[in-house]
Design a protein with these regions (language model features):
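C-terminal, surface-exposed recognition/capping segments
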Residues: 30-31, 48-49, 107-109, 116, ...
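GIY-YIG nuclease signature motif recognition
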Residues: 64, 127-128
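Sec-dependent N-terminal signal peptides
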Residues: 6-15
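N-terminal secretory signal peptides that target proteins for export/translocation
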Residues: 1-3
Length: 190
């Protein structure tokens, strides 16, 4: 009888131990809502399977600066062929921005303005790629603070021009340089 009581006591202790050590699922894996303040800007996109930089089980996405960095600035480097700035996909804006800066010594250009931005201690801002810029357009009502202007992307067009997007119509222009100046809104990846 004494052995039975001891056995039941061990089962009880073991069960309580398992219960207290069980891992509680937390809400930390919830996808944050588009439009919230996040890492110095406003969250506008959470990476999905197939996106460059997507890692299953991890939260990664894109944040936009809360206001324009410039309202009248050139894409820059007129007459200079920019190599490596022709990527359009989500996840390629930073690479395009670096390629533009490496090929162009002008200081007052869209890519440079974005790369030099520091907001709330975050200094990894860049000019969005064509597809990243389109995501901004699609979410502009949630993000707010966007005007119906032409915005630059970091995606080059034909080596000499840059892609831009009209935030009134949503139309994307490959020969955006003919318009001269565009607005700039920096983004960052997390």
């Amino acid at each position: 009888m004494k052995d039975l009581k001891y056995f039941l006591f061990l089962v009880l202790v073991f069960t309580i131990g398992l219960k207290s050590c069980s891992v509680q699922k937390s809400n930390t894996n919830k996808t944050p809502k588009i439009g919230i303040t996040y890492q110095g800007g406003i969250l506008f996109y959470v990476l999905q399977e197939g996106d460059i930089g997507y890692v299953s089980g991890e939260l990664h996405g894109l944040v936009v600066a809360p206001s324009d960095q410039s309202s009248e600035i050139e894409w820059g480097c007129f007459g200079t062929r920019i190599k490596g700035a022709n990527k359009t996909a989500v996840g390629t804006g930073a690479q395009n921005t670096l390629a533009i800066i490496a090929s162009c010594k002008e200081t007052q250009i869209a890519a440079k303005v974005c790369s030099e931005l520091v907001l709330e201690g975050y200094d990894d801002w860049f000019l969005p790629s064509k597809d990243e810029l389109n995501l901004l357009y699609l979410n502009k009502d949630v993000i707010t603070n966007f005007g119906d202007f032409y915005y630059w992307s970091s995606t080059g067009y034909g080596g000499f021009n840059g892609w831009g997007q009209d935030f009134f119509s949503g139309y994307q222009y490959g020969n955006f340089d003919e318009y001269g100046y565009g607005h700039v809104r920096a983004i960052q990846a997390f």
